[in-house]
Amino acid sequence: MMIHSKRRTFLKAGLIASVGLAVVNQLQSQAVAQPANPAELGTFDLKKLNNADAVLIAALAPVILAGTLPQAADARKVAISEVVDAFDRTIAGLSPLVEGEIRELFSLLHFSLTRKYLAGVAKPWDEASEAEIAAFLSRWREHRFALFQGAYQALAKLMIACWYGNPLSWGAIEYGGPPYGKELGL
C-alpha cells in the first residue's frame, strides 16, 4: 500500500510539473521581450536567433568578454555585433539536439519570471546593468547544481569562441592569424 501511495504522489507531482512547464512555455512564447531599441544593436541577418536572443547575447558579451572588447564606443558596438553574428552562425552549425538545448536556455532567460527567479535579474536584459549580469553569471558559475554550471559554461565558452574566432580580437592578443597556403609553402 505504501509503494502505491508514493507512486501516485510521484505521478501527480510529475503531471503538475508538466502542466506548469507547458503553461510557462506558452506564456513565454507569447511574451518574449523584444529589444527596447533594436537599432542600437545594428542590423543582423539572423538565421537561428531572434531579436530577443540578440539582445541577450549583446547584454552578456561585455561581461563575459570583460577587458577584451575595444573601449571606444563605435568599435565596441561593432565588436558586440560581430559576437552576436558569430553566435548565430555557431548555433546554426550545432546539432538539432544542442540547438534545442540552447533554445530552451534562452527561453528560460527571456521569460520574466524565470529570468527573475533563476537568473536573479529582474529587468529585461537590455536594461540590466553589467553588475547585475556579472552577479547572475557568477551565481550560475558557482551554483551547487551542475545544470546551472553547465548552462554558464555553455554561454561562456560559446561567447569566448565567437569573439576569439574573429580577426577583430587578434590584435589585442598579438595573434597574427592562422597560417595560409603561401605561408605554409603550398
Ranges and model annotations:
Residues 64-67, 71:
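Secondary-structure edge/capping motif, primarily at the C-terminal ends of alpha-helices
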Residues 3-4, 21-59:
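C-terminal segment of N-terminal export signals and the immediately downstream linker at the start
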Residues 1-21:
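N-terminal secretory signal peptides and thylakoid transit peptides that target proteins
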Residues 9, 14, 52-55, 150:
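Generic recognition of stable, solvent-exposed alpha-helical segments in well-folded globular domains
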Residues 2, 42, 56-59, 71-186:
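Mature-region segments of soluble proteins
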